[in-house]
């Protein structure tokens, strides 16, 4: 199975730790690719609608290549820190640009990992969860999981062996 992980964090901290734990569990026979939006040149969506006429974004940047890679996946894992009660701008920008070929994302297996600086009962996680549920409903995604983690210091998640084991287990579960 082809798994594309979109890392919405520009930092090498807790979100990357979560991604690596999931990827370790999913390794097996899966082809895993991590997309790092902060390393790409992707202009914000202008809402021009030209993509609907030209079968892709008309911006001369990394959008179409990135969307091709996402569309080719059997599973998409969205991973993000919480920024101001929502997903990171880096992840949101990639999601916004998926509009140009959104129907190619129908029926995908998906998962969501969110790491924030507040306890997981905080409303910020619920807001992000609900947004992904709406996307999943619209695009008929098979949402395999949504996991939220509370971590403030750079290595908090790396010290949480229970969370790391659960993330590896989630990775192994996608092989079934």
Task: Kindly give the residue locations of the regions a language model identified.
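N-terminal beta1-alpha1-beta2 submodule of the flavodoxin-like/Rossmannoid cofactor-binding fold
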Residues: 1-79, 85-101, 145-147, 157-176
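Acidic, low-complexity intrinsically disordered regions
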Residues: 80-81, 137
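Short glycine-rich anion-binding loops that position phosphate/pyrophosphate groups of nucleotides
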Residues: 82-84, 117-118
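Short, glycine-/small-residue-rich phosphate/pyrophosphate-handling segment
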Residues: 106-146
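A short acidic, helix-capping loop that chelates divalent metal ions and anchors anionic groups
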Residues: 115-120, 151-157
């Amino acid at each position: 199975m082809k798994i594309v992980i979109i890392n919405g964090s520009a930092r090498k901290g807790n979100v990357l730790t979560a991604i690596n734990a999931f990827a370790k569990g999913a390794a097996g026979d899966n082809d895993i690719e991590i997309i790092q939006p902060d390393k790409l040149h992707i202009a914000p969506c202008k809402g021009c609608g030209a993509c609907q006429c030209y079968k892709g974004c008309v911006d001369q940047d990394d959008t179409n290549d990135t969307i091709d890679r996402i569309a080719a996946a059997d599973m998409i894992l969205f991973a993000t820190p919480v920024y101001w009660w929502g997903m990171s701008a880096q992840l949101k920008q990639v999601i916004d640009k998926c509009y140009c070929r959104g129907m190619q994302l129908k029926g995908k297996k998906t998962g969501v990992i969110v790491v924030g600086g507040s306890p997981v009962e905080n409303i910020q996680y619920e807001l992000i969860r609900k947004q992904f549920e709406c996307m999943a409903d619209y695009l008929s995604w098979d949402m395999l999981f949504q996991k939220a983690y509370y971590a403030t210091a750079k290595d908090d998640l790396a010290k949480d062996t229970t969370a790391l084991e659960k993330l590896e287990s989630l990775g192994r579960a996608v092989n079934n």
